[in-house]
Swiss-Prot record:
Gene encoding the protein: rpsF
Keywords: Ribonucleoprotein, Ribosomal protein, RNA-binding, rRNA-binding
Annotated PROSITE patterns: RIBOSOMAL_S6
Function comment: Binds together with bS18 to 16S ribosomal RNA.
Annotated Gene Ontology cellular component terms: cytosolic small ribosomal subunit
Biological process according to GO: translation
Compositionally biased intervals (Basic and acidic residues): 104-113
An example molecular function term from Gene Ontology annotations: structural constituent of ribosome
InterPro entries associated with the record: Ribosomal_bS6 (IPR000529), Ribosomal_bS6_CS (IPR020815), Ribosomal_bS6_sf (IPR035980), Ribosomal_S6_plastid/chlpt (IPR020814), Transl_elong_EF1B/ribsomal_bS6 (IPR014717)
Annotated protein name in UniProt: Small ribosomal subunit protein bS6
Length: 125
C-alpha cells in the first residue's frame, strides 16, 4: 500500500456536514485495510482567491496508507460531490504523523490568546 496526503476544501455553507464526510472517507480507508496516519480539520479559512464567488472554505487534511483503488474512489467522490470545492491527492514516500505547519501555528497562537485574555481581565480589576 502507498502513502497519500489528501487535502479537500468544502463549501462554507456545508461545514456542519464535514464530520460526516470525514467519517465516511476514513471508513472507506479502514474498510479497504488502510490506515489513517493523520487527520486534521483546519476549519473555515480565508481563500487566497475567490472560488465560485466564495471567499472562505472548510479545509480538511488526511494522511493515509491505502491501495490505489481507494484513492480512485475518493477522487471520484470528490469530483461528483458539489460540496467539495477543490481537492488534492499527493503520493508521499512515507507516513506523515507529525502536526502540519497549519496545526502547529494554530496551537502556538492559542496560549498567547489565553495570556492576552488574562491580562485584559487583570486590567479590568
Amino acid at each position: 500500500m502507498r502513502h497519500y496526503e489528501i487535502v479537500f476544501m468544502v463549501h462554507p455553507d456545508q461545514s456542519e456536514q464535514v464530520p460526516g464526510m470525514i467519517e465516511r472517507y476514513t471508513g472507506s480507508v479502514k474498510e479497504a485495510g488502510g490506515q489513517v496516519h493523520r487527520l486534521e480539520d483546519w476549519g473555515r479559512r480565508q481563500l487566497a482567491y475567490p472560488i465560485n464567488k466564495l471567499h472562505k472554505a472548510h479545509y480538511v487534511l488526511m494522511n493515509v496508507e491505502v491501495p490505489q483503488q481507494v484513492i480512485d474512489e475518493l477522487e471520484t467522490t470528490f469530483r461528483y460531490n458539489d460540496a467539495v470545492l477543490r481537492s488534492l491527492v499527493i503520493h508521499t514516500k512515507h507516513a506523515v504523523t507529525e502536526a502540519s505547519p497549519m496545526k502547529a501555528a494554530k496551537e502556538e497562537r492559542k496560549p498567547l490568546a489565553e495570556v492576552e485574555n488574562n491580562d485584559f481581565e487583570d486590567a479590568e480589576e
